[in-house]
């Protein structure tokens, strides 16, 4: 069993998938609407998990995880904003256990590789279909 954080959980599909596989899931989203949708997804599927409203790591002080998963948002209305994703990556080492992993799904054009390199000292690309990439960085 891994202790997993689903950052920007939305309606909880990834959280439910992880919980169904026996992982201890904490799901967070800045949106109260999304957090409630995630709670309902877990409840309706008889799955356990902790769901919190949190602006990135704000509700998770002192918490550490084996894995952090996210498809980080980069839009604020119609503008591109890297604020949340920047904090997600830069502060990940403080919230990962030793050998913990940060796994991101992202549009291929987003500038995450450089940030992952700086924050965690490296990364690998697990999947790349030219439109989306899945990155994994290990602490």
Predicted features by range, described:
Residues 29-33, 84, 107:
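Short beta->alpha hinge that forms the Motif I/post-I loop of the SAM-binding pocket
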Residues 86-98:
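A short glycine-rich, Lys/Arg-flanked "PGG" loop and its adjoining helix->strand segment in the class I
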Residues 1-64, 70:
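Conserved SAM/SAH cofactor-binding pocket of Class I
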Residues 121, 128-139:
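Core SAM-dependent methyltransferase catalytic element
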Residues 69-79:
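A short SAM/SAH-binding and catalytic strip from SAM-dependent methyltransferases
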Residues 20, 97, 121:
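Short conserved AdoMet
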Residues 108-119:
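Conserved class I S-adenosyl-L-methionine
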Residues 99-105:
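Conserved beta-strand signature within the Rossmann-like core of class I S-adenosyl-L-methionine
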């Amino acid at each position: 069993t891994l202790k997993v954080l689903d950052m920007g959980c939305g309606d909880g599909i990834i959280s439910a998938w992880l919980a169904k596989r026996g992982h201890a899931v904490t799901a967070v989203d800045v949106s109260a609407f999304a957090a409630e949708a995630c709670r309902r997804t877990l409840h309706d599927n008889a799955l356990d998990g902790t769901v919190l409203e949190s602006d990135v790591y704000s509700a998770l002080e002192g918490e550490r995880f084996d894995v952090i998963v996210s498809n980080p948002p980069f839009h604020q209305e119609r503008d591109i904003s890297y604020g949340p994703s920047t904090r997600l990556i830069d502060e990940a080492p403080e919230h990962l256990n030793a050998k913990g992993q940060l796994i991101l799904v992202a549009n291929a054009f987003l500038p995450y590789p450089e940030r992952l390199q700086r924050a965690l000292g490296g990364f690998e690309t697990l999947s790349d279909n030219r439109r989306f990439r899945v990155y994994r960085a290990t602490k």
